[in-house]
Amino acid sequence: MPRRRRASRPVRRRRRPRVSRRRRRGGRRRR
């Protein structure tokens, strides 16, 4: 079994662009 490489530096999480699904689907505005 190939060994998994351990990341030496902390992995940065990829930020997803903010998508407001709630507004699109429900059409309800959040206060």
Curated annotation (Swiss-Prot):
It is found in: Nucleus; Chromosome. Its main location: nucleus. Keywords: Chromosome, Developmental protein, Differentiation, DNA condensation, DNA-binding, Nucleosome core, Nucleus, Spermatogenesis. One of its GO terms (biological process) is spermatogenesis. Residues 1-31 are annotated as: Disordered. GO terms for cellular component: nucleosome; nucleus. One of its GO terms (molecular function) is DNA binding. Testis. The protamine CIII/PPC 6B sequence is shown. Protamines substitute for histones in the chromatin of sperm during the haploid phase of spermatogenesis. They compact sperm DNA into a highly condensed, stable and inactive complex. This is Protamine CIII. It comes from Oncorhynchus mykiss.
